[in-house]
Amino acid sequence: SSILADWDFKGTIDVASELGFSCVELACWPQGKAERRYGGVSHIDTEGLTKERAAEILDCCRQKKVSLSSLAYYPNTMDGDAAKREKAIEHLYSVIEASSMLSVGMVTTFVGRDSQKPVEVNLELFAKIWPPIVKFAKERNVKIAIENCPMLFGIDQWPGGQNLFTSPVLWREMFKIIPDDNFGINFDPSHFVWQQMDYIRPIYEFRDRLFHVHFKDIKLLRDKLAECGVLAYPLAFMLPKIPGLGDVDWGKFVSALTDIGYDGAACIEVEDRSFEGSRDMI
């Protein structure tokens, strides 16, 4: 729901209902100023959530026939800045608690990454930070679904990006570290498109870890790529698009999901700037 930054919770659910959506992945950043684009949106104040407010939220969802697929918070819990890291982790715990209180049972997020350190060091950091988080969630019957976005788009995330959970190679390593059955994937095929990776095969290999899905597209600008190469800032050779306007083969993607019997949420993630000019366009 981050695209609906100017709407409050009720307004967001109203819009979803009017447009015929059956569920919403609800943005739950901390209250206050956003630190990045599509971040900082808070449709529920998880740190101040009471049983009374939770009941109001659930009642609104029931009346509008819109469920919450997940509570979403995508910070960098492995930030090289220790203060930022601890702040992100602290709020993530509140989001997990709120997901349990609201009987949502899902939190979608990033594992994070120290962008100045190599993969090997980040895996060690992951092994220290994430097992307690996943255990905390499991005790509250909450699944943790990690999106496969590298969070590497421009100079702000250079050089390593801000999320380690980027490829099947790394997924296998992280699932060895945390084999818990409530730790899985929020799969967005668009990130594999611009990295020129296979986005169909992982659906079959990781079928038991596939908890949540994003429908977002990417247009790979091959003329730009031919000039700047894969080591350029990614936004130099790709454009995020709404589903159907990029290079994802949605027929093959949905076919693979049906092959494995996926019956979870599929949420449209809008980061297409062509549709951000007004409320009507959004």
Where in this protein do the model-derived segments appear?
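Glycine-/proline-rich flexible loop or hinge segments
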Residues: 37-44, 72-80
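Histidine-acidic metal/acid-base catalytic patches
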Residues: 1-23, 28-30, 56, 62, ...
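Active-site acidic/histidine proton-transfer and metal-coordination neighborhood
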Residues: 17, 55-70, 76-184, 194, ...
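A generic secondary-structure micro-motif detector
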Residues: 2, 46-47, 85, 123, ...
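Conserved radical SAM core fold
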Residues: 29-34, 77, 114-116, 151-153, ...
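Glycine-rich, proline-tolerant flexible connector loops at the mouths of alpha/beta enzymes
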Residues: 25-58, 117
